[in-house]
Structure formats: C-alpha cells, structure tokens
C-alpha cells in the first residue's frame, strides 16, 4: 500500500512529459504477467487473477478480520498441461465455482480454494492455437464471458457464440444439458470485440447479446434457452 501511495503521489506531482511516461511504463510493467483485465473478488475477499501461462492466483488479507492487514498469496493453481492458452476471462457461478476460459477454447471450473477442478474444450476450437489474427488481443477467444443463475456460461469465440453448462459437478457442451453453439457473421475476420451480455430475466424472453464481426457491426441476440415454437427467424 505504501508503494502504491508513493507511485500515485509521483503521478500527482508530474503527470506529463518524458519522465512521467518512464514512470508509467515502470508501473505498468508490474502487471506484465496478467493475461487480461477480467479478475474476480469473492465474498470472502479473495482476489483471483489469471496469468498468460494458465496460472490462477488467489490473494487475501493476512488477517481476515482486518481489511488493512497485509495482502498475501493464499493459493495458486496451474492448469493441467493439456489446457493451453492465456486466461482470457474469470467469473463465478451462482453456486460459487470459479470459471476461467482460455484463448485456445478451454473452459476450467475451479473450487474457490483451488483444490478441485473440471475442464472442457469448446466446440469448433480445433486449431485455435493458430487462429489469432493479430499478435495481441485477437485470439480465438478474446473477451470475457457471462454466467446466468442456471449455470449457463456464454462465451464468444472467433465465429461462434457458445453456451456451456455448469451442471453442479462438471462442465457440459451437450445439447441434452442445454448447451448450444451458433455461428454469427464475421466479415472482418477478427470476431466480436464484445463481452456477451445477458438480457431478459424472470418471465421475460431471455437472450445473450453481442455485436458481430462485420465491418459495420450488428447487435445480435441469441435465445439463451429453448427457442419458442412460434418464433420466426429473421432472414
């Protein structure tokens, strides 16, 4: 905390010019292991961060009763060897499992103590390791994701919208569990730049919404659950 305060004070004193840029670069370099900006803080004040190498780290207060106590590394989990790609998003299910998605199309569910885990790979992700369209931030998965209260996990890949289902004891991409995959327009080739958003709750029509990959983007709504029998698809 004292180092953070000192850095902020230095920016307050001088926030322009060459030396300010050097200071900003040095401070930003402390975050070089982060894979993305999507992190999670749980109800017990554990802070979870994902790395470029598939490592999840949990930080917490040294004294759980004192929020001003020293922050310590509480737990760490390295993805198994077969799960590849930088961590592109972190979130949590309504029953308290931490969910991560990697750039190469893997989804990992972890207990909050990082001792148990389940993995699955998204459909259409074959060869995702070689499908990045630019050096940074344009991989097969490049955004965060959304989770609904029924365990639906909504992930946008380079050309598809995916619903993965957390069943309570595992991850599923099977339609029998309510999972699905749908293609969207991708004229510019890089895929959507949007994090999926949930729309409709309670008795309302339930959708997941993204912008597509067209040069002039369209807003696209996907039915989250079973499509009504009387719905007429747009041409």
Question: What name fits each language-model region?
Answer:
Residues 7-9, 22-40, 78-95, 130-147, ...:
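Repeated scaffold domains used in trafficking and secretory/extracellular systems
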Residues 3-5, 53-64, 104-112, 158-167, ...:
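Structural motif
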Residues 144-235:
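Long, internal scaffold/assembly segments composed of regular secondary structure
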Residues 17-29, 68-82, 116-136, 178-186, ...:
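A short beta-strand motif characteristic of beta-propeller blades
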Residues 1, 45-51, 95-102, 108, ...:
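Short beta-strand elements that form the blades of beta-propeller/WD-repeat-like
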Residues 38-47, 54, 62, 93-98, ...:
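Elongated scaffolding segments in large macromolecular assemblies
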Residues 98, 102, 112-116, 124, ...:
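Glycine- and small hydrophobic-enriched segments that form the cores of compact globular domains
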Residues 1-76:
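Post-signal peptide N-terminal segment of secreted/secretory-pathway proteins
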């Amino acid at each position: 905390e004292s180092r953070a305060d000192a850095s902020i004070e230095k920016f307050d004193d001088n926030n322009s010019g060459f030396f300010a840029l050097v200071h900003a670069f040095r401070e930003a370099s402390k975050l070089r292991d982060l894979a993305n900006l999507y992190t999670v803080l749980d109800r017990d004040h554990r802070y979870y961060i994902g790395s470029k190498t598939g490592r999840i780290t949990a930080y917490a207060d040294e004294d759980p009763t004192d929020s001003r106590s020293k922050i310590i590394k509480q737990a760490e989990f390295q993805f198994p060897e077969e799960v590849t790609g930088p961590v592109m998003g972190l979130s949590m299910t309504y029953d308290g499992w931490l969910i991560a998605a990697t750039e190469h199309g893997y989804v990992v569910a972890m207990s909050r103590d990082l001792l148990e885990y389940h993995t699955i790979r998204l459909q259409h992700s074959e060869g995702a390791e070689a499908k990045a369209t630019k050096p940074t931030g344009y991989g097969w998965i490049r955004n965060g994701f959304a989770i609904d209260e029924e365990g639906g996990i909504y992930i946008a890949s380079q050309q598809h919208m995916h619903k993965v289902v957390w069943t309570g004891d595992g991850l599923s991409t099977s339609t029998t569990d309510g999972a699905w995959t749908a293609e969207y327009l991708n004229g510019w080739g890089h895929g959507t730049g949007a994090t999926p958003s949930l729309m409709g709750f309670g008795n309302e029509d339930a959708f997941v919404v993204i912008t597509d990959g067209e040069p002039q983007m369209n807003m696209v709504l996907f039915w989250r659950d079973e499509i009504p029998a009387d719905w007429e698809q747009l041409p």
